[in-house]
Swiss-Prot record:
Keywords: ATP-binding, Chaperone, Nucleotide-binding, Phosphoprotein, Stress response. It comes from Acidithiobacillus ferrooxidans. This is Chaperone protein DnaK. Induction: By stress conditions e.g. heat shock. Autophosphorylated. Belongs to the heat shock protein 70 family. Acts as a chaperone. It comes from the Bacteria. GO terms for molecular function: ATP binding; ATP-dependent protein folding chaperone.
Length: 20
């Protein structure tokens, strides 16, 4: 999944950019 912006599904629970 590609998430650019607010991502509450990460350990950072903040603005993050994930790819994979």
């Amino acid at each position: 999944a590609k998430v650019i912006g607010i991502d509450l599904g990460t350990t950072n629970s903040x603005v993050a950019v994930m790819e994979g």
